[in-house]
């Protein structure tokens, strides 16, 4: 019989009580364990019943204990469990045997069932007593647990208290081998790292390996791209960057995995350059699969890292265990720019991997074959000659001259052919379009590739500068041979002023084209660059806003890397395809003089051309009342020019079309000068208004002591699309931005009644007032007339009425309280 306590325990376990039922012929069915006993009272299969009954016990215990804790107990005796199971079923077997011999009533069957269940419940109770959970490592050593938590959270007070009281040592660990320094490093807790290394009670060892990967704290910091933590380890401790974790990765490998270009540059300068001493890293050191850092950078498609590694001599021909060179791994991402850099660096495009596949077959497997073919063609390889380098028959300088002077020939032919008054309008127009498009196509296919291997090469070629200068040349020729002989004395002042403007825009055009726009000097010694990096780290500014990762030099304020000249330009304004040069601190004044003088020259040329047409009208006896001589939509003098001077008429019309973007460019440049902005800064300001903030690779710790003043930097503009490129070519992109800001100023309001001004939402650090900004742009030094004609010798220019060197400008002059509006 089952006593009262057993019945109460049975009621307290509903899972078992619900699954225990009386079956046919008196069998005991335990559904939870899925075991069955036959009508003869024998267990069908001893091993199966043993397993199934144990399952029933486990299911019972699941309702009262945490299964994980139960399974974790090491003192569970398998033999005792089998004995308990045998005892549990002995009651049931004996009872059913008597049942077969005497055929007792059904109440005896219920008694047997209860006894069997009582045995199972007793087993469960015994197991519960035998499987009490043991305390965890954290519970056994709460002080060490508190230390780890404090390091993760950056609680310096708690860390110093635990270490100074001697409750724990800095190098104490749990069974995983992870130290407090590991947790402080990976959580970017610089003050905690410093304390653990420098305290007088228990100093941490930066070379202890821990965790599943058996990595050092330096490894953990490198894997997460934490520059300031790594710098502290390298400079102030004996942390060894050559140590390897269980995956055979050293500090440089892990830094490449992080894709933080600033950390990679730091390690290259401090450990791989000629300035490194004892902590020397080999740039081509491989892991256990023979993969170098360049292999990993190529696999990740990380262009900045690839360029940095190549700058330090990384070998593009290194092979791993699968005979893959970095180029093969680059096909995993298939980025065109990455493939082009590796191909241009001398990668063997016919190298085969362990499967016998070269770059072409790998490209097919990765669905980037077409991209690879484009890359090879842009790199100057000939598909008709086994992809060998093409033979260049034209010198690059000659190619540039041909591109530049082609419009000098094409434009006059087009203007002369388009004499629509004589008939054949469609054939003449068709011929002109074909001539213009055909010449550009020939230049793009045959001439431009001799000096520029890019897909969109037209904007970066001298073609647009040739179109402008060719137009100006034929305007000057027309003025000299048509207008001056006829109107020299009638319009003497106009001709004199026009000649002055012609001289100004021609001189400023070629001067702005050939002058150095303001290249920031790049140190030739890596030790100088490393010193610049350390200076930036000290003030918490080592990021891509303050360091150029393309040229490896500290970026002065208002500078920007030019993808046209491949150099860092001081006070960068924009790249202008019409002058075939960047506009920077040394040629910005020249560019504005060019735009202003060109604007007025176009107006005067148009004015004098109309006067010439009017003079021709009087001399030719043109009858304005004769309907047959009139022109649709044209005045009488323009009609005469259309019929009698069609070359000059077409040239004037072409100049007026160009005048649209010239006028807008004048307005925008004037507005930006008055606001103390450059074109690039104005574009970046628009992005800030739209909250498109760029990532600058900064890993500055939150607990870093910022003792220097904060610098206002502009974010880079968004990537251009087709429409924005067209707007930039004709100078309307800045107009669009100005209109956007104007619309926001009109329709956007703050929560108050006051009008919202987008330009005032962010402080412009270079805006010192309209008057000061205007004078700063035109004068170098004191405000004297002679100084307006001076051009910067290097990077000097005025800012807030003070001469500054834009090559070394790292702080803005403070604004005065009485800044003019």
Swiss-Prot record:
Similarity field: Belongs to the DHHC palmitoyltransferase family. AKR/ZDHHC17 subfamily.
Ribosomal protein among keywords: no
Name of protein: Palmitoyltransferase AKR1
Broad class of the protein's primary localization: membrane
Organism of origin: Debaryomyces hansenii (strain ATCC 36239 / CBS 767 / BCRC 21394 / JCM 1990 / NBRC 0083 / IGC 2968)
Gene Ontology terms for molecular function: protein-cysteine S-palmitoyltransferase activity
Disulfide bonds: none
Entry EC number(s): 2.3.1.225
């Amino acid at each position: 019989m089952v006593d009262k306590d057993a019945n109460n325990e049975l009621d307290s376990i509903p899972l078992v009580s619900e699954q225990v039922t009386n079956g046919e012929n008196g069998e005991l069915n335990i559904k939870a364990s899925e075991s069955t006993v036959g009508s003869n009272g024998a267990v069908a299969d001893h091993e199966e019943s043993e397993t199934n009954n144990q399952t029933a016990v486990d299911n019972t215990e699941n309702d009262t204990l945490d299964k994980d804790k139960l399974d974790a107990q090491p003192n569970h005796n398998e033999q005792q469990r089998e004995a308990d199971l045998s005892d549990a079923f002995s009651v049931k077997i004996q009872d059913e045997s008597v049942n077969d011999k005497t055929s007792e009533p059904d109440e005896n069957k219920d008694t047997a069932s209860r006894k069997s269940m009582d045995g199972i419940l007793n087993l469960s109770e015994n197991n519960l007593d035998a499987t009490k959970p043991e305390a965890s490592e954290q519970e056994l050593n709460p002080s060490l647990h508190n230390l780890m938590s404090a390091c993760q959270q950056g609680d310096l007070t708690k860390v110093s208290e635990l270490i100074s009281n001697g409750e724990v040592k800095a190098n104490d660990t749990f069974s995983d081998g992870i130290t407090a320094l590991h947790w402080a490093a990976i959580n970017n807790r610089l003050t905690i790292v410093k304390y653990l290394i420098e305290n007088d009670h228990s100093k941490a060892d930066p070379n202890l390996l821990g965790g599943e990967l058996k990595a050092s704290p330096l490894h953990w910091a490198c894997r997460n791209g934490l520059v300031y933590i790594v710098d502290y380890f390298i400079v102030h401790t004996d942390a060894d960057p050559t140590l390897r974790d269980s995956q055979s990765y050293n500090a440089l490998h892990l830094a490449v995995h992080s894709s933080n270009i600033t950390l990679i540059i730091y390690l290259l300068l401090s450990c791989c350059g000629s300035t490194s001493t004892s902590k020397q890293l080999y740039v081509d050191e491989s892991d256990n699969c023979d993969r170098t850092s360049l292999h990993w950078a190529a696999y990740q498609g990380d262009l900045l890292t690839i360029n940095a590694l190549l700058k330090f001599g990384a070998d593009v021909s290194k092979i791993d265990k699968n005979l893959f060179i970095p180029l093969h791994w680059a096909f995993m991402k298939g980025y065109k720019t990455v493939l082009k850099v590796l191909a241009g660096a001398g990668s063997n495009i016919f190298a085969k991997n362990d499967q016998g596949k070269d770059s072409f077959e790998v490209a097919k497997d990765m669905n980037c074959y077409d991209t690879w073919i484009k890359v090879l063609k842009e790199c100057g390889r000939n598909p008709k000659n086994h992809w060998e380098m093409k033979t260049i028959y034209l010198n690059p300088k000659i190619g540039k001259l041909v591109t530049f002077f082609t419009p000098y020939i094409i434009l006059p032919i087009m203007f002369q052919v388009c004499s629509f008054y004589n008939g054949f309008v469609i054939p003449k127009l068709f011929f002109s379009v074909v001539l213009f498009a055909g010449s550009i196509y020939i230049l793009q296919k045959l001439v431009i590739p001799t000096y520029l291997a890019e897909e969109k090469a037209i904007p970066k070629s001298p073609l647009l500068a040739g179109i402008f200068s060719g137009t100006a040349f034929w305007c000057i020729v027309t003025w000299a041979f048509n207008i001056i002989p006829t109107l020299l004395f009638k319009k003497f002042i106009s001709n004199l002023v026009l000649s002055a403007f012609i001289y100004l825009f021609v001189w400023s055009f070629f001067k702005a084209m050939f002058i150095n726009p303001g290249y920031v000097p790049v140190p030739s010694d890596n030790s100088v660059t490393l010193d610049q990096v350390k200076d930036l780290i000290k003030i918490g500014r080592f990021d891509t806003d303050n360091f150029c990762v393309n040229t490896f030099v500290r970026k002065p304020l208002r500078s920007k890397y030019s993808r046209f000249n491949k150099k860092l330009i001081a006070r960068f304004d924009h790249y202008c395809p019409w002058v075939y040069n960047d506009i920077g601190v040394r040629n910005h004044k020249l560019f504005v003089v060019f735009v202003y003088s060109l604007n007025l020259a176009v107006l005067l040329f148009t004015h004098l051309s109309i006067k010439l047409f009017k003079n021709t009208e009087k001399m030719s006896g043109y009858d304005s009342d004769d309907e047959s001589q009139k022109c649709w939509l044209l005045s009488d003098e323009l009609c005469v020019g259309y019929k009698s001077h069609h070359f000059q008429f077409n040239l004037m019309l072409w100049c007026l079309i160009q005048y649209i973007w010239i006028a807008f460019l004048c307005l925008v440049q004037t507005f930006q000068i008055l606001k103390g902005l450059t074109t690039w800064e104005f574009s970046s300001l628009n992005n800030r208004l739209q909250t498109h903030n760029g990532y600058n690779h900064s890993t500055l710790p939150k607990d870093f002591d910022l003792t220097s003043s904060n610098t206002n930097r502009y974010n880079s503009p968004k990537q251009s699309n087709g429409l924005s490129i067209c707007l930039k070519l004709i100078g309307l992109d800045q107009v669009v931005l100005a209109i956007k800001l104007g619309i926001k100023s009109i329709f956007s309001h703050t929560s108050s009644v006051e009008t919202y001004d987008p330009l005032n939402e962010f402080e412009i650090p270079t805006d010192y007032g309209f008057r000061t900004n205007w004078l700063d742009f035109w004068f170098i030094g004191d405000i004297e007339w002679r100084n307006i004609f001076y051009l910067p010798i290097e990077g000097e220019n005025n800012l807030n009425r003070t001469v500054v060197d834009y090559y070394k400008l790292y702080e803005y002059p403070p604004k005065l309280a009485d800044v003019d509006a």
